[in-house]
UniProtKB/Swiss-Prot annotation:
GO terms for molecular function: metalloendopeptidase activity; RNA endonuclease activity; zinc ion binding. Binds 1 zinc ion. Its main location: cytoplasm. It is found in: Cytoplasm. Zn(2+) binds at residues 124, 128, 134. InterPro entries: MetalPrtase_cat_dom_sf_prd, YbeY, YbeY_CS. This is Endoribonuclease YbeY.
Length: 158
C-alpha cells in the first residue's frame, strides 16, 4: 500500500500524528473491501481557499467544502465495475483533497477532536473513491455504516 500525503497549505502544522491518522484511516477503510495491499492513494492537505477553487473548477460549485475525491476507476459500493489491466506494482485508486482548515472548523462545531474529524473526512473520501455516495437516503445510511465501523475500530467515537 502506498499512501502519498502532500501538504499544500501553511495554516496548520501537519505532523507525524496527523499523517498517521490519515494513513490508518485509508488502510482501515480499504481492508474492508480489498483483498490485497497493492493500491496507491494520494492525499493532498489544503486550506479552504484552495479547495474552494478546486470545487469551482471540477464541480462548478463556488464554495469551500471539506473534502473532494477523484476516483480513477469506477466502483459501486466497494465493488470494481470495470476490468483493469495491472501494469504497475500499486494500482492507483485516486486522489483525495482534504481542507485541514475546514477540518478544524468542523471539529469545533461538532464538539469532537480534530483527529476524529480528519479520520472521518479521510474515511469518507476513501469510500467515495470506492463508489459510495450519499445522495439517496439508503446510500447515505450504507456509507454512514462503514464510516462508523472504521472510526469505532480506530477508537475514534463521538
Amino acid at each position: 500500500m502506498k499512501i502519498i500525503i502532500q501538504n499544500q497549505q501553511d495554516k496548520y502544522q501537519i505532523d507525524e500524528s496527523i499523517s498517521k491518522i490519515i494513513e490508518d484511516s485509508v488502510l482501515n477503510t480499504l481492508k474492508i473491501f480489498m483483498d490485497d495491499e497493492n493500491y496507491e492513494i494520494s492525499v493532498m492537505i489544503v486550506d479552504n481557499q484552495f479547495i474552494k477553487e478546486l470545487n469551482k473548477h471540477y464541480r462548478s460549485i463556488d464554495k469551500e467544502t471539506d473534502v473532494l475525491s477523484f476516483p480513477i476507476f469506477e466502483f459501486k459500493n466497494g465493488e470494481l465495475q470495470e476490468d483493469i489491466a495491472i501494469v504497475e506494482e500499486e494500482i492507483p485508486l485516486g486522489d483525495i483533497v482534504i481542507s485541514i482548515e475546514k477540518a478544524y472548523e468542523q471539529a469545533k462545531e461538532f464538539g469532537h477532536s480534530v483527529e476524529r474529524e480528519i479520520a472521518y473526512l479521510t474515511v469518507h473520501s476513501v469510500l467515495h473513491l470506492l463508489g459510495f455516495d450519499h445522495i439517496e437516503e439508503e446510500d447515505r445510511m450504507l456509507m454512514r455504516k462503514y464510516e462508523e465501523m472504521v472510526l469505532e475500530g480506530m477508537g475514534l467515537t463521538r
